[in-house]
Amino acid sequence: MGPPLKLFKNQKYQELKQDCMKDGRLFCDPTFLPENDSLFFNRLLPGKVVWKRPQDISDDPHLIVGNISNHQLIQGRLGNKAMISAFSCLAVQESHWTKAIPNHKEQEWDPRKPEKYAGIFRFRFWHFGEWTEVVIDDLLPTINGDLVFSFSTSMNEFWNALLEKAYAKLLGCYEALDGLTITDIIMDFTGTLAEIIDMQKGRYTDLVEEKYKLFGELYKTFTKGGLISCSIESPSQEEQEVETDWGLLKGYTYTMTDIRKLRLGERLVEVFSTEKLYMVRLRNPLGRQEWSGPWSEISEEWQQLTVTDRKNLGLVMSDDGEFWMSLEDFCHNFHKLNVCRNVNNPVFGRKELESVVGCWTVDDDPLMNRSGGCYNNRDTFLQNPQYIFTVPEDGHKVIMSLQQKDLRTYRRMGRPDNYIIGFELFKVEMNRRFRLHHLYIQERAGTSTYIDTRTVFLSKYLKKGNYVLVPTMFQHGRTSEFLLRIFSEVPVQLRELTLDMPKMSCWNLARGYPKVVTQITVHSAEGLEKKYANETVNPYLTIKCGKEEVRSPVQKNTVHAIFDTQAIFYRRTTDIPIIIQVWNSRKFCDQFLGQVTLDADPSDCRDLKSLYLRKKGGPTAKVKQGHISFKVISSDDLTEL
């Protein structure tokens, strides 16, 4: 069973189609009429628009002619390049386009049974976290007999024109499609999670290791059903569509249609002086201006391969506008990568995506307000919603996506464009369960771009630990909904922090409700004990308060360990000490290296401290070798930290 399906405008495709067939009429959609209001709310029409059905445009109309990816698409006089690029990308993976165009064979024209055609189509979009089915009629806007928006070079193929109309209906009108990015459109067509990679910032041409790591990620994404596109930025409008020295177009988005790591046979190793080739195949949605550099059809490299070589290696091209290029040339020529990961396929096992819908709301009470503005608003910033997640091991890449509810559908009513949004990421205590109130010790682990696009992204390789993500609008005091999605190779247990402090309950009142909150960061342990010169010391920390304990990751083979381990405790009294212990991780029995015992009173200094380790037995126990550096902050205001 697939995901729950929402019916846009509550229109039921099968019922509407049956009614039309019963009455012997073609469907005309009362919720998206063939009128100028369905086209624009601000722009002027360039001519008289006549709405025509496909059979009035072509003698032999079809939804799809042959293979969906075989024909080039044209943006039309009022269309946009991003839409054409997204269509081209969508056509690469059948699992995605068949989701956007459900039961396409059933929706197809059948000349043998014309009575079954009712002029009605349905398409599905991933809209703000829900799969939504949109029903349309087949009336398409034309000027002088030509389609106004996108059309296929196969003049009797209409899937893209009809899909574009359904998308326009979902967003309010055709004008609402203007300004959408290719990542916005692909996410709406597929439900994938997008990441935008700056090729120049990543220095993939300079750093060999990073280049091959990128190839590995792209290969994994593509083979798992992801969609990848790339573009060359143009510094000015005048340079849009200008051809580079190697035949590539600036300002256009190219679709990746294949990616291969090739092992060469003995003869080809001699020819190319390498045992492996890292290759990508790209397609220009316009079907022209192909790559003319190495591995192009006119290149020396290509000519040195026989037809059999190309077939055996998989270096084949099925469409006009397709070409192969090496990973090195790919990294050198393109500036931006749009990587849309397929996160909805259960075949791949592990739960890789976690998501939550939230909202920014306004309240006069600072503890209830959830619209605190960006990081610049230091007094109110932490009044935003807060979400915590856990990275279970070092070195996992985490992709974070924050999407605001698109306001384009309300522009007709005078509502503003999208808000400027972004988010901040903080590494927090390993046992945090309540909201952040001040940032005394937390490490700022990342920040997204702040921009008025629908979606902002951030990808980071994160260390093991807990992280709090704070989604924000740039200005405080605004209200809106948002969708937060986090993708990782391992589950990260995304959840919202809603409470400010421990709840009052019969249980904790009987045991004693907390009166003090204490936050501690252990920065390092240095000069640790070694019994003999070649002994291996693998230190780790435990931070204890009563029955609660936090344990740090193990540091390998060092007597000077950097931990930066954080913990927070809600204590009934300062008579319950905090004990920091250092241990040596060993195969059979861990070795105690020393401890520090702290009262952590609210009146204590909050600066960085350094204390010698001692044996067990309290603050007056015998001193041992080594010392730790730490910072402790205590407060009798449970909502300070």
Swiss-Prot record:
GO terms for biological process: microtubule bundle formation; regulation of cytoskeleton organization. One of its GO terms (molecular function) is microtubule binding. GO terms for cellular component: cytoplasm; microtubule; perinuclear region of cytoplasm; spindle microtubule. InterPro entries: C2_Calpain, C2_dom, C2_domain_sf, C2_III, Calpain_cysteine_protease, Calpain_domain_III, Calpain_III, Calpain_III_sf. The keyword Cytoplasm applies. Residues 344-495 are annotated as: Domain III. Keywords: Cytoplasm, Cytoskeleton, Microtubule. Residues 26-343 form the Calpain catalytic domain. Residues 498-621 form the C2 domain. It holds the Pfam family C2. SMART domains: C2, calpain_III, CysPc. The keyword Cell wall biogenesis/degradation does not apply. Interacts (via domain III) with microtubules. Interacts (via domain II) with ARHGEF2 (via the N-terminal zinc finger). Belongs to the peptidase C2 family. Microtubule-stabilizing protein that may be involved in the regulation of microtubule dynamics and cytoskeletal organization. May act as a regulator of RAC1 activity through interaction with ARHGEF2 to control lamellipodial formation and cell mobility. Does not seem to have protease activity as it has lost the active site residues. This is Calpain-6. It comes from Rattus norvegicus. The lineage of its organism: Eukaryota, Metazoa, Chordata, Craniata, Vertebrata.
